[in-house]
Design a protein with these regions (language model features):
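Glycine-rich segments within core transmembrane alpha-helices of 12-TM secondary carriers
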Residues: 120-147, 163, 327-341
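Helix-breaking motifs and short loop linkers at transmembrane-helix boundaries and internal kinks
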Residues: 31, 62, 83-88, 232, ...
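Extracytoplasmic
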Residues: 1-34, 219-224, 340
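Cytoplasmic helix-loop-helix junction between adjacent transmembrane helices
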Residues: 93-130
């Protein structure tokens, strides 16, 4: 089961990554400023609202059907970027395609949370994150194609069609989650079965997601531009930097998953979120060996923090609303982060240094660590039905 979900993460991550890695090159062809790039990235993120009805549909008809549909549609739409006659057309295709990839990622994580055991949920998400890293890495690895000519960035979008092979495998082999089948059976025989989204948990996670994504979105969008314009890196050098600083973070993901399942989500998150963020932000103010080293260490710590923070999003909500809650958190995260992108683009265009912008935005994840310490429940070693008592009736189904 985990192997199939891992495969599903490949196209999802590619679709999610390709625009952030190529926007600097597309902007060169179309003459777009850094502020314009930030605004475009914000628009693409706002498109995530189209995932809300998909989440509602997945909670009603099942995870499998929606995951398979998105695995087919998302790569096809994203590949239309290769045909862009203008920057506006490119942004339009990604405003539709990228949110579908994001929705695919969210639904896969929900699927894994429902299927994995009490002491392996965070670890499973860490393994899926490695798959996402491979998918995203394939987009990063294709960056040298963007350096061939002013318009060769289009090739990076075109090769995304190859991910349709994964959709074929999922169509043939992916089952439905046992928890959803139990819920569906219960609802069929007892029409009065009702659950609700815990609003306090939802608003808390929305706040945490927004504060985190203000930094993450800005760092991911402007890293290539920083390396290209400030450090004078070529397309190949940018690809090497991102790849070589990301690989160690993959080890951090697996370690973080094990730690989150063994010692608890809260301890891992509190220790690694602020330190990893501040270190990674500092890499935008450094150069040479120091820039590489700090980016690697910061990336490893953020990798360790990811499974603990990610698993909360689906653990804290009942089966009937797990996809919807997860998508609402993601929507708020991306829309909130888009505001950060616009602000960052404005600040950079008006002379503020990359290092100062990133360190300012790093305050968000520092606040997140405090919120996790004060407000989050510990979910390690607990069944989902224990965390969400309204699902207790499903255990006997």
């Amino acid at each position: 089961m985990l192997k199939l979900l891992w495969l599903a993460c490949l196209p999802a991550a590619y679709v999610n990554t390709v625009f952030t890695q190529t926007v600097a090159y597309a902007s060169t062809e179309f003459g777009i400023t850094e502020q314009g790039q930030g605004f475009a990235a914000a628009i693409v993120r706002w498109g995530v609202i189209i995932a809300i009805p998909l989440a509602s549909y997945a909670d009603k008809v099942g995870r499998r059907r929606v995951i398979i549909g998105l695995a087919w549609i998302a790569p096809l739409i994203i590949s239309l970027g290769a045909l862009s006659p203008s920057f506006t057309f490119l942004v339009a295709t990604q405003t539709i395609g990228r949110p579908l990839g994001i929705a695919l990622t969210v639904f896969v994580l929900v699927f894994a949370t429902e299927e994995m055991g009490t002491n392996t949920r965070a670890w499973a998400l860490s393994i899926l994150a490695v798959g996402s890293g491979v998918g995203a890495g394939s987009a990063v690895g294709a960056i040298p194609l963007a350096g061939i000519s002013d318009s060769s960035w289009r090739l990076v979008y075109l090769i995304g069609i190859a991910w349709l092979a994964v959709a074929y495998v999922l169509t043939r082999s992916l089952p439905e989650t046992k928890r959803f089948l139990a819920l569906h059976e219960e609802q069929t025989h007892h029409t009065d079965v009702e659950t609700h989204i815990h609003r306090d948990r939802l608003w808390l996670q929305i706040a945490v997601a927004v504060l985190t994504n203000v930094f993450v979105a800005t760092a991911s969008i402007f890293q290539s531009r920083y390396l290209k314009d400030v450090r004078g890196y070529s397309a190949l050098e940018i690809s090497m930097f991102i790849t070589l600083t990301t690989i160690p973070a993959t080890v951090g993901l697996v370690v973080g998953g094990r730690l989150a399942d063994k010692v608890g989500r809260k301890a891992v998150a509190i220790a690694t979120v602020p330190t990893g963020t501040l270190l990674f932000a500092s890499s935008f103010a450094l150069q040479g060996f120091a820039m590489w080293l700090i980016a690697i260490v910061g990336g490893v710590l953020l990798g360790i923090s990811y499974p603990a923070m990610a698993v909360f999003r689906s653990e804290l909500f009942p089966t009937a609303h797990r996809n919807m809650a997860s998508i609402l958190i993601m929507v708020a995260s991306l829309i909130g982060g888009s505001v950060g992108l616009i602000v960052a683009g404005y600040l950079l265009d008006n002379g503020m240094s990359y290092g100062r912008v990133m360190l300012t935005f790093a305050l968000g994840p520092v606040i997140v660590a405090a919120l996790v310490a004060a407000k989050y429940p510990e979910t390690a070693h607990r069944e989902l039905e224990d965390i969400n008592p309204e699902d207790a009736h499903l255990q006997g189904s």
